Every structure is written in structure tokens, then in C-alpha cells.
């Protein structure tokens, strides 16, 4: 149903009886009638909204084409190649036709793009090569069409600087790591902004809602804004084959979270990046801006993180709590390395307030959300389980964070002296 905004002066327009606008079928009809009453000159010109109903309208025709199912007529499919852009957080994509449905990334051709237009290559040598790495079903086009997560390489076969997947894949392929079957559960927080003013969804423009408290997991038109986007994203992820495990409204109004996992090794990064892509596309269609800024609003408002839950096979087995404590000890000794890799602008979020630890001080605790590393009460009670790294920012790269956790806890060995000092400082009896 399209709409026409009509000015107030008296006017009447009738579509001729035999006009081409009129569909021959009795099912289809179209008429435009604009009528206004005379108003005195001293009155403001008013407007009336009148409906233009037409199954043959431009909008309907475009929607019909968008919803076309090509499967009965062709084996060819559309593959949307997706990659990470020059900022390390922006996503890019483009489409190509593939002759038949595929089941594995190895069946797909490599492709290329203009890296000088994404900040990833100089103009005189701009070609960057896309290597297909993971396939997901396309919830926007349906059918056998697919989304393809790619990483980025030079023509000579070297990963470009923004390709963090390559190093992560190398770490996860190490037998010491793969043998421990590392699981990751990633909690992606994000904030929805009004398109034209870049202010949180549901907030009065240039002003603030009531203080935090009623919004976390809240219900009601005065507490929650953006649920349709969250739900649409949830279903799109399930359709795509992403291992999404839940969603919830967050502490700051206009902020949401989705969880991915548990996923093994490199899959965690692939699934989070594809989930982010779907969210970007859905907010694009909704006319809402998505931001992963770790502190979108200064002041007494929660920031946005990407808490990462982590366990290994040894942690999940009997006696695993001792393995968890050893992992925490290692993480404490590489705190600076992790912080430097955990997202841009994280110093604005990790202040020691709003359920965060100080960025300058490593800490751990049971059920304590003000620590760097949190251990759940179930894990403590059972003597096995997982740990939660609460330091990563919402704009972190999941390839970096997951592989660094595996590297620090499974491949890196501190000196005995450093280990003893750290254990004493953290009250860890390892």
C-alpha cells in the first residue's frame, strides 16, 4: 500500500476510464483521488495522506522479484562473498553466480576485489584475493543460495595484515590445541542507533531515558526498543546455520546481546563474523544504525563487551578446576598482550565500573562480574567447567581473541619464578 501526500488546495484528479494504469483484471485496481476543502488564506496549508492501492505498483513489483524462487528454473545459485575490510571491523561483500549448489568451501572459486577501495592495498597494486573458508545458508535470498566467509590474501599467497583468520587457523591446527578441543561461547553486545541522529534507539534525541535498572531483559514499550531486529536476527542466524544460542536485551536501553556457541576452534570466529554480517544487513533494511563501539554513550551507562567463555577438554573433565586455575595464572602474566588485542577504545569501557574490571589490573573471582576473569559457581561446585574472559570489547576480532586464549593457555609456558609470583599475588594454589 503506497501513500500520496496531497496539498490542501482544492483539486481533483481522476484516472481516465481506459488509462493504462487500470489493470484489466478485476483483481487489480488503481485509483488516485486527491480532494481538499477550500481553506481561507490565513490558514496554514494542510496535508492529507491518501492511499494508492495497486498490486502493480513499483514497490510490489520489486518485492515480487526479490522473493522469486529461481530453484525450479536453474541449478545456478548466488554466492555472497563476505570479507573483513580495512578497519579490521567493517564488513564488505559482493555476489557472484555459481553453476551448481556446493557443500564445501573448497568447491568454490577464489575471487578478487579492489583493495585500494577498502584501505587494504595501494592503487598501483590493488588486487586482493578472496579465499572461501566457510559456507552458510543465505536467509535473504533463500533457496540454495549461500553466504561465504572469506579471508584475504595477496596474489603471491600471503595473508594481508587485516587477515587475522590465517594466524588463528595456524594456532588451532596445532596438535596441542586441537587435541584439547577448545570450546568458545561468545556474547556479542551491540547498540542500535537512530539513523539520522546517531543516538540510541528509543532515546529522546539529545536527551536521556530514565536511569539503568528496568531495561536488562525487560519487557514493555517503555523499556525495550529494537526487539524486532533482535528476533529477526535470531531467526536469520538459525536459518543460516549459525550456532546461535540465545539473545537478550542489555542493561543500557537500545543495547542488545546475542550469544554464539559453544563452537570449536576456528568455527567460533567464522560464526560470529557471519552473525555480525546478518545483523548489519537486517539493520540496513530496518533503517537503523548498528554500532559495536565499546562505550557508545559516556557517563553512567554500561558499555558494550564481547565476553568470551572458554574451556578445554581437560577443563571439562574431572579435576578441571585445577586446569582452569593454571589457565588463569597464564592469562594474568600476559594481561597487557591480551588487552592490546581485545578491541579499540576498550579503555573507555574497562574502568572498574558498570560490571567491568580496571584495564590496568588483572583480577579473577567466582561469580564476580567486576573481574577480568569470572568463574561460575557451577564450575567451582563441580570442580570442572569453563572460565569467562570479560575483557574483550564489543568490536574485538573473534579470530584474534579465541586464538590468543588458546595460545596463552595451551602453548605458552611462563618461567617458574613468574608463575610462583603470579600464583601468590592472585591467591591461586596451583
UniProtKB/Swiss-Prot annotation:
Tissues showing expression: Expressed in mesophyll and epidermal cells of leaves.
Gene3D superfamilies from the UniProt entry: Glutamine synthetase, N-terminal domain (3.10.20.70), Glutamine synthetase/guanido kinase, catalytic domain (3.30.590.10)
Modification Phosphoserine, positions: 106
Specify the inducers.
By light, sucrose, glucose and fructose.
Record keyword ATP-binding present: yes
Which PANTHER family would you find in this protein's record?
Answer: GLUTAMINE SYNTHETASE (PTHR20852), GLUTAMINE SYNTHETASE, CHLOROPLASTIC_MITOCHONDRIAL (PTHR20852:SF118)
InterPro entries named among the record's database cross-references: Gln_synt_N, Gln_synt_N_sf, Gln_synth/guanido_kin_cat_dom, Gln_synth_cat_dom, Gln_synth_gly_rich_site, Gln_synth_N_conserv_site, Glutamine_Synthetase
**In terms of one coarse class, where is the protein primarily found?**
plastid
Ranges for domain GS beta-grasp? 77-157
In the Enzyme Commission scheme, what number(s) does this protein have?
A: 6.3.1.2
Subunit-level organization: Homooctamer.
Q: Which Pfam families match?
A: Gln-synt_C
Official protein name in the record:
Glutamine synthetase, chloroplastic/mitochondrial
Subcellular location per the Swiss-Prot or TrEMBL entry = Plastid, Chloroplast; Mitochondrion
The role this protein plays is: The light-modulated chloroplast/mitochondrial enzyme, encoded by a nuclear gene and expressed primarily in leaves, is responsible for the reassimilation of the ammonia generated by photorespiration.
User: Which organism does this record belong to?
Assistant: Arabidopsis thaliana (Mouse-ear cress)
Judging by the UniProt lineage, the source's domain of life is Eukaryota
Q: Where is the transit peptide?
A: 1-45
Family membership, please give it.
Answer: Belongs to the glutamine synthetase family.
Amino acid at each position: 500500500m503506497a501513500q500520496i501526500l496531497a496539498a490542501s488546495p482544492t483539486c481533483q484528479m481522476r484516472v481516465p476510464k481506459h488509462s493504462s494504469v487500470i489493470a484489466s483484471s478485476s483483481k487489480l485496481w488503481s485509483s488516485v483521488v486527491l480532494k481538499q476543502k477550500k481553506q481561507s488564506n490565513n490558514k496554514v496549508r494542510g496535508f492529507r495522506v491518501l492511499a494508492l492501492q495497486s498490486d502493480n505498483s513499483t514497490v510490489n513489483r520489486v518485492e515480487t522479484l526479490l522473493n522469486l524462487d529461481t530453484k525450479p528454473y536453474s541449478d545456478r545459485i548466488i554466492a555472497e562473498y563476505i570479507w573483513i575490510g580495512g578497519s579490521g571491523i567493517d564488513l564488505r561483500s559482493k555476489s557472484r553466480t555459481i553453476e551448481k549448489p556446493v557443500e564445501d568451501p573448497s568447491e568454490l572459486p577464489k575471487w578478487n576485489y579492489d583493495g585500494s577501495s577498502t584501505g587494504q592495498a595501494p592503487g598501483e597494486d590493488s588486487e586482493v584475493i578472496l579465499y572461501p573458508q566457510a559456507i552458510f545458508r543465505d536467509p535473504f535470498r533463500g533457496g540454495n543460495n549461500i553466504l561465504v566467509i572469506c579471508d584475504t590474501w595477496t596474489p603471491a599467497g600471503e595473508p594481508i595484515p587485516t587477515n587475522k583468520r590465517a594466524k588463528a587457523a595456524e594456532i588451532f591446527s596445532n596438535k596441542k590445541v586441537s587435541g584439547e578441543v577448545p570450546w568458545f561461547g561468545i556474547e556479542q553486545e551491540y547498540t542500535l542507533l537512530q539513523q539520522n541522529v546517531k543516538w540510541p534507539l528509543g532515546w529522546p534525541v539529545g536527551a536521556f531515558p530514565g536511569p539503568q535498572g528496568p531495561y536488562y531483559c525487560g519487557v514493555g514499550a517503555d523499556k525495550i526498543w529494537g526487539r524486532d531486529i533482535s528476533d529477526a536476527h535470531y531467526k536469520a542466524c538459525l536459518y543460516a546455520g549459525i550456532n546461535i544460542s540465545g539473545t537478550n536485551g542489555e542493561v543500557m536501553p537500545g543495547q542488545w546481546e546475542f550469544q554464539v556457541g559453544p563452537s570449536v576452534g576456528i568455527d567460533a570466529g567464522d560464526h560470529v563474523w557471519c552473525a555480525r554480517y546478518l545483523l548489519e544487513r537486517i539493520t540496513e533494511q530496518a533503517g537503523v544504525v548498528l554500532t559495536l563501539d565499546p562505550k557508545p554513550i559516556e557517563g553512567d551507562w554500561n558499555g558494550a563487551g564481547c565476553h568470551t567463555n572458554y574451556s578445554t577438554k581437560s577443563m571439562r573433565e574431572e579435576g578441571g578446576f585445577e586446569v582452569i586455575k593454571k589457565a588463569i595464572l597464564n592469562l594474568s602474566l600476559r594481561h597487557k598482550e591480551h588487552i592490546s588485542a581485545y578491541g579499540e577504545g576498550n579503555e573507555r569501557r574497562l574502568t572498574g565500573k558498570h560490571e567491568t574490571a580496571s584495564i590496568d589490573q588483572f583480577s579473577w573471582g567466582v561469580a564476580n562480574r567486576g573481574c577480568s576473569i569470572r568463574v561460575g559457581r557451577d564450575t567451582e561446585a563441580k570442580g570442572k567447567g569453563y572460565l569467562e574472559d570479560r575483557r574483550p570489547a564489543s568490536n574485538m576480532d573473534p579470530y584474534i581473541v579465541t586464538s590468543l586464549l588458546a595460545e596463552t593457555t595451551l602453548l605458552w609456558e611462563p618461567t617458574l619464578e613468574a608463575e610462583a609470583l603470579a600464583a601468590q599475588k592472585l591467591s591461586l594454589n596451583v
